[in-house]
Amino acid sequence: MTRKQKRLAIIGGGVGFLTAAVLLVMFAFSQAVAYFYVPGDLAKADLAPGTRIRLGGLVEAGSVKRGDGKTVTFSVTDTLAVVPVTYTGILPDLFREGQGVVAEGAFVAGSSVFVADTVLAKHDETYMPKDVADRLKAQGVTLGGKENIQ
């Protein structure tokens, strides 16, 4: 092999290695990504049952029901739509009606109930998409816990 052929072989091997690494990273990210939706956007979204998503909004007033053991059912709303959620586990200390929440999980096939395996409670609109926070403020919902949904 000449020097030129060796150089081309090394460059070709490096490009092949980098291509394989990029493809593996892209595949891993596509499996781990959970897109964020608010209840009003779910009607437009074409989600297959079992697709993992993050559902964000406010815990609807009067919707929290404690079941057997650690099972809790509640509804998440963005004032346009309401989604029933079931969660089994210990809820965060900041979780309460009228407060912001992000639940990660999936819809069960043949059901409109969102089954969450992770629930994060928020105390204000800091991590809420701007359009959702603006819509809630326009409806008179204060996101610091001072006022609840009417």
UniProtKB/Swiss-Prot annotation:
Residue intervals annotated with topology Periplasmic: 29-150
Pfam families in alphabetical order: CcmE
Keywords recorded for this protein, A-Z: Cell inner membrane, Cell membrane, Cytochrome c-type biogenesis, Heme, Iron, Membrane, Metal-binding, Signal-anchor, Transmembrane, Transmembrane helix
Membrane topology: Single-pass type II membrane protein
InterPro entries: CcmE, CcmE-like_sf, NA-bd_OB-fold
GO BP annotation list: cytochrome complex assembly
Residues the record lists as binding heme: H123, Y127
Disulfide bonds, paired cysteine numbers: none
Domain of life according to the entry: Bacteria
Free-text function comment from the UniProt entry: Heme chaperone required for the biogenesis of c-type cytochromes. Transiently binds heme delivered by CcmC and transfers the heme to apo-cytochromes in a process facilitated by CcmF and CcmH.
Entry protein name: Cytochrome c-type biogenesis protein CcmE
Biological classification of the source: Bacteria, Pseudomonadati, Pseudomonadota, Alphaproteobacteria, Hyphomicrobiales
Gene for this chain: ccmE
